[in-house]
Amino acid sequence: MNKDHTTKRYVFVTLLNVVITIAEFLGGIFSGSLALLSDAVHNLSDVGAIILSFVAHLISRRSRNQHKTFGYERAETLAAFTNGVILIVISVVLFVEAIQRFWEPEHIHGGIMLVVSIIGLVTNLISMFAMHRDSKGNLNVRSTFIHMLSDALSSVAAVIGAIFIYFWNVTWLDPVLTILVSLFVLHEAYEITMKAANVLMESNPNIDLTKVNEIMLSFPEVKNVHHVHVWRYSDNFIMMDAHINVDRNLQAGELEQLYQKIGKKLKEELCINHITLQAECERGRNDKMIVSGRGNNEN
């Protein structure tokens, strides 16, 4: 992902969303459309979400130092998690408001709603496609893209609702479409939030530990594998550490070569980017791959 191009896209999308948010708020107030106001609220939240993602993107580019020896890449994961939570809250709020609108219907000016919603749809589609390219390999950009996608869907719902209201006065369609959009966004936001949470909790990124064990034990020098940890540091960087039991008479040079061979095979077959191995002779020889407890005695 080109960092400079991503930066330009963030700036462009932010400015575009500020303009459309103002337009949709005014249009929603004058038309009385909940779908249009919900779209405006989406856009307002998007402005904050985009700024948050952009700041995290800039922070993630900082170099490693004595205080952040791993670097700052997880700033983007934190931003993705925050944006996911924000999207969940917004979805729930819009769902509740739509239900209330069924019981307390208001007059809606379909003409104003239609014009403003079409403008919103066009700008939201532009924003969505601007962020789409970088959203595939970065959870932070993905969370921003989902914001854009949710707004585009809200705009589509607003356009459809405006047409039915303007020509046939079908006002109940406005809250129905809002409910459908809020449920879709809730589903997408939940997935992003859980993915970000798994990274922050250093969960196993679907690496088969049985396969890890088989690969390392395929080397005759390795007698046992224990205290294995595999986690995703960021979207595209998987790390692993493990203890291996080897013969006592193995020399330092031979041990280094063994590390290199194991590391190469793990990277080739399981796409693990960074591997740390600790060799032992007798200690832990009978331990399992995953040792129960909090691991305070690991060293």
List the predicted regions and their residue ranges.
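Alpha-helical transmembrane segments and adjacent TM-loop junctions that form the membrane-embedded core
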Residues: 1-12, 35-37, 41, 45, ...
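Histidine-rich, glycine-flanked metal-binding segment
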Residues: 1-31
